[in-house]
Amino acid sequence: RSTLFPYTTLFRSQPLDVGSGKTVVAGLVAAEVAQADFQTAIMAPTEILATQHAKTLDELLSPFGVSVALLTGRVKGAQRRQLLDNLANGDINVVVGTHALIQEKVAYHKLGFVVIDEQHRFGVKQRQALLQKADHMPHLLSMTATPIPRSLALTLYGELDISILDELPAGRQPIVTKIWSPASAPKLYETIDHELAQGRQAYVICPLIDDNPDNDKKSVEAEYHKLAKTMFRHRQVGLLHGKLPPEEKAAVMQQFADGELDMLVSTTVVEVGVNVPNATVMLIENADHFGLSQLHQLRGRVGRGQHQSFCHLMLSGHDKPSQRLREIEKSQDGFYLAEVDLKLRGPGEIYGRAQHGALSLKIASLSDTPLIARAQTEAERFVKEGRDLLQYNHLARAVSRYQRLTILN
């Protein structure tokens, strides 16, 4: 609270491990903002995620008189007009939505706090458009459930304050992670069916949508038909991938969340998805073709309830498991795995090619966290002393280019 009020504008990045409760953190801040008679806007990358956030926040905040509304493309007609009126006159304290939050007709009464969930999923212009809905620069919280190394966080988000949550809610059991070879598939399917027989649910993740004769990766279409017609023909099996129409994707995901499906065969579209506490099994086919961070994100879809959860990593062939698979088998610490990923793949691959030039440091290495932290401290002192960056033309140009890549406002 002391960070927010009275007049200091908050710019904070919040990298969290999967399942660590980031929505609750945003909700607690939103409650403080509402108490100060300002509004909060929370923008999520998908309608499914926005709906989940709105439900969670409404349950958390409505007992305290904080009103929460959901604005997505599905809200139409009279319901939409009424919601927009309530938002403009201040009757809504917290609005959660997708890109609908930045449409021209959407007006806020007193927007004071902006939360961008999984900010790397939005373009710079989209993030700017939401911030510009406020009369004055609002507080900003950028959240991601993708753990990144501290050195990378300092480099990428040096202009923001950083809060890292690396603890899970109390009572969460560790997820049992195991590597399997294709020869062990029948035994694995029996293990999964045993879980389903107890009323639990399972994800099966494939790297491709359609079969590709040029490689041996499993496609979600072929795997769905195989599982639904053979080993799990007595179960309710659903199919999900990015080529499905948005309405169909949302309907399938909702069926799974409501317990109408026992198994969901999907691509990585579930990497950032709804919270299904009853899902206790994650099977990742061709696991050796995924990066560490993505494997950890997918594993985080289970282990959210009271029951023991399992993550099964199926190899593509009979070769020995790679180092990254061994690392994820033995550790559930997302930030440790991010450090390992940094060493194995390098910063450009982790954060994306668009950022690679900005991360090519001339002197330091991104594995040298103490040096980067010291450099950040010195840079802050340089600015506080009123030193003129323009005296150093080459550095000024580099900083300007870097800011265009990373700055949110």
Show which residues each predicted segment covers.
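Single conserved hydrophobic/aromatic residue that forms the stacking wall/gate
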Residues: 1-9
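Inter-lobe coupling/hinge segments of SF2-like helicase ATPases
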Residues: 11-326, 385, 390, 409
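C-terminal accessory region of SF2 helicases/translocases
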Residues: 306, 310, 318-409
